Curated annotation (Swiss-Prot):
SUPFAM superfamilies cross-referenced by the UniProt entry: Proton glutamate symport protein (SSF118215)
Name of the featured protein: Serine/threonine transporter SstT
Catalytic activity: L-serine(in) + Na(+)(in) = L-serine(out) + Na(+)(out); L-threonine(in) + Na(+)(in) = L-threonine(out) + Na(+)(out)
Main localization, broad class: membrane
Annotated gene: sstT
């Protein structure tokens, strides 16, 4: 096999297939490491585990600067003044994202899930009262921006990026272009890091299973079931309720159409941005207002992130349960609000929702090391989790757009 063929095999093609291959190879290495240890003189799984360590370290390094530039550029470049019914669509987007996070909080408490993590004892204690959580949140918000980036204070990074983004909305086009270029540059770096995800998953799975045994897979299966179950509940219960609120008739024909023609495609592309043409074509077939959907669907690909909010919430609560921390429901409700707000920063970035887990974990005093391990867990289950998340996000874009347009038609016909 020549060098170019090997490079193509390792770094090109479907990322889902390569991660699946890394997952399978990691399990195989974990199973054969113990029998081979006496023969080769070392534990093979522990040696390849360094690949997972490097991968998680790279993710932790790029996450603060990624959030800073992406959010700032998105807000600075957002056009001021839109069609009046855009407000209703944006309200649906934000309300749907929050309700998804709220449902995830309920699911996280109803089906507490633990996963196997290393160095559980390194985590700090969670605040006992919501007042302490809020105080910590405020102190993190007013942190020095450079210190926030340097120490990975994600709440401080998010606060400063939002503030600067809003302040720069009236800046010159040249300034906005520079911000967009920086955001694009950081996104490309993230893309390179994500391309190594199969190696990272390989190392993480091999080391975890070798150390903890196959019982570790049980936690992942339950975690995946809770995640996907919450997303399905949101898609087929929560979203139809919101649609009925708008159109005042049976919402399920519209819901099924959007899931079938938009969600299925998004499931395989795993990209809300790549699914925008599919959604626009579906909007045309539904005879929706072109001036509305031409703006709302691309906007939804950036701010309508119910799936990301669910992922952030469920994985954060999994870390809480794994560490045995006592967290009040009110504090968890605050988590749903934070998850809904920061989920917008996950758009257009491979694994973006996973990169925001440390931000949510910091609300409960969970150490950055444990949060980074939860990112690794997210990539292990990401073969199904990320696809389902994208399907929910993208299909909801056209669903809520159609609901508002149909409401306008109903009002005009009355």
């Amino acid at each position: 096999m020549n060098t170019s063929r090997l490079f193509s095999l390792l770094f090109q093609g479907s990322l889902v297939k390569r991660i699946a291959a890394g997952l399978v190879l990691g399990i195989v290495v974990a199973l054969i490491s113990a029998p081979l240890q006496e023969t080769i003189g070392f534990n093979l799984a522990e040696k390849v585990g360094v690949l997972g360590t490097i991968f998680v370290k790279a993710l932790r390094a790029v996450a603060p600067i990624l959030i800073f530039f992406l959010v700032m550029a998105a807000l600075a470049n957002r056009k001021i003044g839109t069609k009046s019914n855009m407000k209703e669509i944006i309200v649906l987007y934000l309300l749907g994202t929050f309700l998804a996070a709220f449902v995830a909080v309920i699911a996280g408490f109803a089906f507490p899930t633990e996963v196997v993590l290393a160095a559980k004892e390194d985590s700090s204690s969670a605040p006992q009262a919501v007042g302490q959580v809020l105080l910590t949140l405020i102190l993190n918000v007013v942190d020095n921006p450079l210190n926030a980036i340097f120490k990975a204070n994600f709440i401080g990074v998010l606060a400063w990026s939002i503030g600067l983004g809003l302040a720069l909305r009236h800046a010159s086009d040249a300034t906005k272009n520079v911000l967009s270029d920086f955001a694009e540059g950081v996104s490309k770096i993230v893309h390179v890091i994500i391309s190594f995800a199969p190696f990272g998953v390989f190392g993480l799975v091999a080391e975890t299973l070798s150390d903890k045994g196959l019982v570790a897979l049980g936690g992942y299966v339950q975690l995946l079931a809770v995640l996907i179950g919450t997303m399905l509940f949101t898609a087929f219960v929560v979203n139809p309720i919101l649609v009925y609120w708008k159109i005042r008739r049976n919402p399920y024909p519209l819901v099924w159409t959007c899931v079938r023609e938009s969600g299925v495609t998004a499931f395989f592309t795993r990209s809300s941005a790549a699914n925008i043409p599919v959604n626009i074509e579906l909007a045309k077939r539904l005879n929706l207002d072109e001036e509305t959907y031409s703006v709302s669907i691309p906007l939804g690909a950036n701010i309508n992130m119910a799936g990301a909010a669910i992922t952030i919430t469920i994985l954060t609560l999994a870390a809480v349960h794994t560490l045995g921390l006592e967290v009040s429901f009110v504090s968890a409700l605050l988590l749903s609000i934070v998850a809904a707000l920061c989920a917008c920063g996950a758009s257009g970035v491979a694994g973006g929702s996973l990169l925001l887990i440390p931000l949510a974990c910091s609300l409960f005093g969970i150490s950055d090391d444990v949060a980074a391990q939860m990112i690794g867990v997210g990539f292990i289950i990401g073969i199904l989790q990320d696809s389902t998340e994208t399907a929910l996000n993208s299909s909801t874009d056209v669903l809520f757009t159609a609901a508002v347009c149909m409401e306008e038609e109903r009002k005009n016909a009355a």
